[in-house]
Amino acid sequence: MSIDFPLGDDLAGYIAEAIAADPSFKGTLEDAEEARRLVDALIALRKHCQLSQVEVAKRMGVRQPTVSGFEKEPSDPKLSTLQRYARALDARLRLVLEVPTLREVPTWHRLSSYRGSARDHQVRVGADKEILMQTNWARHISVRQVEVA
């Protein structure tokens, strides 16, 4: 049995055309690849821990076919499923929020009304990361600095 792609066997060409037709498709594809990498990492950890799918299923409170299906085709795994699977391996799942616009460089703000030298009235607002870390929600997530091209 074979599956015909719209462009034959040229999957890379098909993906390139799909991205050209709908730029949001690239983000969807990247999200799916990231989910697959995460599931692959969980599978590798399960094997490293020498646990069977049956043992993981018992720890998760599901049946083995559920674990098998999750490992084979995680089309869009729920966060709670990923967390339960990780806990079944005595691991903890951590999410990292990447914000490409954050920079480590300090941000400076000049006061709009001043007398005398402007140098005396520059106020350091703080690096974006410092400001983020001062907010309450920042304690609950990790922020990774990403360079913007």
From Swiss-Prot:
Reported induction: Induced by hypoxia and probably by the DNA damaging agent mitomycin C. Part of the Rv1954A-higB1-higA1-Rv1957 operon, as well as the higB1 higA1-Rv1957 operon, which is probably the mitomycin-induced operon; the former but not latter operon is autorepressed by HigA1. Induced in persister cells in response to D-cycloserine.
Phenotype reported upon loss of the gene: A triple higB1-higA1-Rv1957 disruption mutant has no visible phenotype. A single deletion in this gene cannot be made, suggesting that it has antitoxin activity.
Keywords: DNA-binding, Repressor, Toxin-antitoxin system, Transcription, Transcription regulation
GO terms for biological process, alphabetical: negative regulation of DNA-templated transcription; positive regulation of growth; response to hypoxia; symbiont-mediated perturbation of host process
Stored CDD domains: HTH_XRE
Segments of the chain annotated as binding DNA: 53-72
GO MF annotation list: DNA binding; toxin sequestering activity
Organism name: Mycobacterium tuberculosis (strain ATCC 25618 / H37Rv)
HTH cro/C1-type domain segment(s): 42-96
Function per UniProt: Antitoxin component of an atypical, type II toxin-antitoxin chaperone (TAC) system. Upon expression in M.smegmatis neutralizes the effect of cognate toxin HigB1. Neutralization of HigB1 toxin in E.coli or M.marinum also requires SecB-like chaperone Rv1957, making this the first toxin-antitoxin chaperone (TAC) system. Antitoxin aggregation and degradation are prevented by the chaperone.
Assembly and binders: Interacts with SecB-like chaperone Rv1957.
Gene3D superfamilies: lambda repressor-like DNA-binding domains
Protein name as it appears in the record: Antitoxin HigA1
